[in-house]
Amino acid sequence: MPRVKRGVTARASHKKILDAAKGYRGRRKNVFRVANEAVMKAGQYQYRDRRQRKRQFRALWIARINAAARQHGLTYSVFMNGLSRAEIGVDRKVLSDIAIFDKDAFAKIVDQVKAKLAA
């Protein structure tokens, strides 16, 4: 079996890592050993934050809906309870957008919710 020198393969793999580390500060951008650790850590952050993004957006939508509902005299939990009782199937993302961009429509939804809660 012939001897295999790793020159081409090693250069390719190092180049791939160093290209991924472009824009990093200090030795992280041009020293392979340090750059490799930085790129691996960046991958861990990406993986974690893709999941956290979903939680953070849901929390943002809830905060917006809560603020809008309180302007109409309801808390978030009471408002969401009324939504389910009124069988209004609108998710939090859409409700948040309605609360920001179409205040009249949100007011109508709140009126329906209040009517259902009073009944």
From Swiss-Prot:
Q: Name one Pfam family in it.
A: Ribosomal_L20
UniProt keywords (A-Z) are: Ribonucleoprotein, Ribosomal protein, RNA-binding, rRNA-binding
For this protein, the record's HAMAP family field holds: Ribosomal_bL20
Instruction: For this entry, list what GO says about its biological process.
Output: ribosomal large subunit assembly; translation
Q: Which GO terms describe its molecular function?
A: rRNA binding; structural constituent of ribosome
Which NCBIfam families would you find in this protein's record? Answer: rplT_bact (TIGR01032)
The record describes the protein's role as: Binds directly to 23S ribosomal RNA and is necessary for the in vitro assembly process of the 50S ribosomal subunit. It is not involved in the protein synthesizing functions of that subunit.
Q: Does the entry feature the keyword Ribosomal protein, yes or no?
A: yes
Q: Does the keyword Ubl conjugation apply?
A: no
Q: Which family does it belong to?
A: Belongs to the bacterial ribosomal protein bL20 family.
Instruction: Please name the SUPFAM superfamilies in this protein's record.
Output: Ribosomal protein L20
Q: What's the name of the protein?
A: Large ribosomal subunit protein bL20
Looking at the record's lineage, which domain of life comes first?
Bacteria
Q: Name one GO cellular component term.
A: ribosome
Where is the chain membrane-spanning? none
